[in-house]
From Swiss-Prot:
Active site: 13
Tissue: Seed.
Lipid metabolism recorded as keyword: yes
Family: Belongs to the 'GDSL' lipolytic enzyme family.
Stated name of the protein: Seed fatty acyl-ester hydrolase
Disulfide cross-links: none
Source species taxonomy: Eukaryota, Viridiplantae, Streptophyta, Embryophyta, Tracheophyta
Keywords: Hydrolase, Lipid degradation, Lipid metabolism
The organism of origin for this protein: Helianthus annuus
GO annotation, biological process: lipid catabolic process
EC number: 3.1.1.1
Amino acid sequence: DPQVPXYFIFGDSLYDNG
C-alpha cells in the first residue's frame, strides 16, 4: 500500500491507507 497519512494501522508502514 502507498505510504500516505490516512489510516493509522499496522500495514506496510505506520501510515497505510489500505
